[in-house]
Regions:
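Primarily NTPase-proximal linker/entry elements flanking Walker-type ATP/GTP-binding cores
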Residues: 1-88, 92-97
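Mid-core helix/loop region of P-loop NTP-binding domains shared across ATPases and GTPases
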Residues: 169-193
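Short coil/turn motifs at beta-sheet boundaries
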Residues: 37, 74, 180-184, 189, ...
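Conserved ATP-driven motor cores of ASCE-family P-loop NTPases powering translocation/secretion/packaging/pilus
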Residues: 14-22, 33-44, 50-60, 233, ...
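P-loop NTPase catalytic phosphate-binding loop
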Residues: 58-169, 191-277, 281-285, 319, ...
Length: 361
């Protein structure tokens, strides 16, 4: 239920928000959420029960280009992952916290769109390999990732050259044709956006020898470059892991600072929650630490505006997600630079023996 209130002179939305707990008890509802609609008007959203106990996504929720409904917020609205608004995101969570479920929903939501999906799965591909028919590239260990990341950086630089060539501004060029990113390019010239999924990012930082340390430094530098410059080139990062902080090594905190979106599932210690949320929404750290193990998929999402909320991802089986990727395999965009990294498709055995072809003269 929604109510809109016009504020009295001298009131501000914070005054109404401070009364939300009293209103909840007065009206006998589960929660009351207050949001500002416009100057002088606030909206009260009344929720009668805990909608995160059994997740049902809103019926009117529809996906849009680079916008994926992935979870339900505690105020009963959909949590939408908007890559145009928040290009890069860090998702943390312990084992069995629901982090993989969140990742599945992202892949399934992007699969029907004209988007190149690229994966770096440091668990030998067990998380992303089932989605291989829809992936443009897949690396399953740090060695393969070290080969893939330079290609993505070069792809980004090539796209900047394309944008720069378009900016050869002549006096007769209309203002609307001047652009600083791929979205200002004509449809016929605009390359497909790329979403890079990195699962278990900490594995990219682990080293045992001097040679591996040099490789690690190169990979981290390339990830930072993609995070800093990739948005205008249509390259977006989705970085997942169990822990992510300064103890991983050089460049970890610099990379984390570029990941604007934050999602924190259940974690094993308070330090992990602080890694995800303390620098953008400090008050959300306690909420993340309070997530119970028996509620997988529950998480806290925050952004650099300081706002945060609890969300929960609905259940999606791996087989259903893989089926969607198989059905949309024909939608993989053409990105020649990524062809060497395209995962091989398993050959399905024939139901009956195939007759041999006649030998011609």
């Amino acid at each position: 239920m929604r109510l809109r209130l016009r504020l009295a002179p001298g009131q501000e939305p914070a005054d109404v928000a401070a009364s939300a707990e009293r209103l909840r008890h007065a009206w006998g509802v589960h929660a009351v959420y207050v949001s500002e609609i416009k100057p002088g008007v606030v909206e009260l959203r009344l929720v009668g029960f805990d909608v995160l106990r059994k997740v049902r996504m809103p019926r009117r929720t529809t996906a849009d280009f680079l916008k994926v409904p992935v979870a339900l917020r505690e105020d009963s609205t959909a949590c939408v992952r908007d890559y145009r608004a928040i290009p890069h995101q860090l998702t943390l969570g312990a084992t069995l916290s629901g982090k993989s479920m969140y990742l599945r929903h992202l892949v399934v939501g992007l699969a029907p769109q004209r988007v190149a999906l690229v994966g770096i799965d440091c668990k030998r591909g067990v998380e992303l390999a089932p989605f291989a028919p829809r992936l443009s590239a897949l690396a399953t260990d740090p060695a393969q990732a070290a080969e893939l990341l330079p290609v993505l950086v070069q792809l980004m630089e090539d796209r900047y050259d394309l944008i720069k060539a378009r900016q050869g501004i002549a006096p007769s060029t209309p203002d609307e044709e001047i652009t600083s990113d791929i979205w200002g390019l004509p449809d016929a010239e605009r390359p497909a956006p790329v979403v890079l999924f990195v699962d278990e990012v900490a594995e990219l930082f682990l080293v045992a020898t001097r040679k591996e340390e040099d490789r690690r430094d190169e990979m981290v530098t390339q990830l930072i470059r993609l995070a800093q410059l990739g948005r205008a080139a249509g390259i977006y990062l989705e970085v997942c892991g169990q822990r992510f902080g300064a103890e991983l090594g050089k460049g970890a905190t610099m990379l984390r600072a570029q990941l604007t979106g934050r999602v924190c599932h259940r974690v094993n210690d308070e330090a992990s929650a602080k890694m995800a949320l303390a620098d953008i929404a400090p008050e959300a750290v306690g909420a993340a630490c309070a997530i119970a193990p028996e509620r997988p998929g529950l998480a806290v999402v925050g952004d650099t505006s300081g706002g945060w909320s609890r969300i929960r991802t609905p259940y999606l089986s791996l087989s259903d997600a893989a089926a969607v990727c198989a059905e949309t395999a024909g939608l993989v965009p053409v990105v020649p630079a990524l062809d060497p990294f395209r995962p091989a498709m398993p050959v399905q055995p024939a139901d009956q023996p195939v007759p041999p072809l006649p030998v011609s003269d």
